[in-house]
Regions:
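Exported/periplasmic cell-wall-interacting domains
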Residues: 33-49, 78-87, 92-164
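Cell wall/extracellular polymer interaction/catalysis modules
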Residues: 2-21, 26-80
Length: 164
């Protein structure tokens, strides 16, 4: 509840500042609003955890309750290939993985549930209809996430992607 109030307050203050003509929102203020938005409830708050919000197509990384990266926009599974919700753990990492199933490069792959992985793609995150179940990120975000994770870190996938 505190997280929800903090998020609502941060968004309201930023909106009031812009609408009321108080001035522009600076980088620090915008960052605070972004971080507050990342506080939408990630069910897991113990240790380092990747939070994947399917409903909003966002990913961020937390240490406990503190957001240390993101949120960033991601692209998850399309209809028939939904990214499976649940609490998973990174079990295998491959910097230069190539899918044997789809014969496609999957840079910065971090597998968390059978063949589903966090990895980079070279297309916009808004490209429909979605992935084959993986959590796609930009090359920049995938490289940053790669540096922050190791085998054993939690991956909490929650919500539901519209249309799946």
């Amino acid at each position: 509840m505190k997280q929800l109030k903090a998020r609502v307050t941060a968004v309201a203050l930023a909106t009031a500042a812009l609408v009321g003509g108080v001035g522009t929102v600076g980088a620090g203020q915008a960052d605070a609003v972004t971080r507050a938005a990342a506080a939408s409830p990630c069910p897991t708050t113990i240790g380092r955890v990747v939070c994947v919000d399917l409903t909003h197509q966002k990913l961020w990384i937390q240490d406990g309750r503190k957001t240390i990266y993101g949120p960033v926009t991601v692209r998850t599974g399309r209809k028939g290939y939904a990214t499976r919700p649940g609490l998973w753990h990174v079990y295998w990492r491959d910097l230069h993985h190539v899918s044997s199933l789809y014969d496609v490069a999957m840079p910065y792959s971090q597998f968390f549930d059978k063949g589903q992985a966090l990895h980079a793609v070279d297309i916009p995150m808004s490209t429909p209809p979605g992935s084959h179940g993986c959590v796609n990120m930009t090359m920049h975000d995938a490289a940053a996430v790669w540096k922050l994770l190791k085998v054993g870190n939690a991956v909490d996938v929650f919500g539901r992607k519209p249309g799946t």
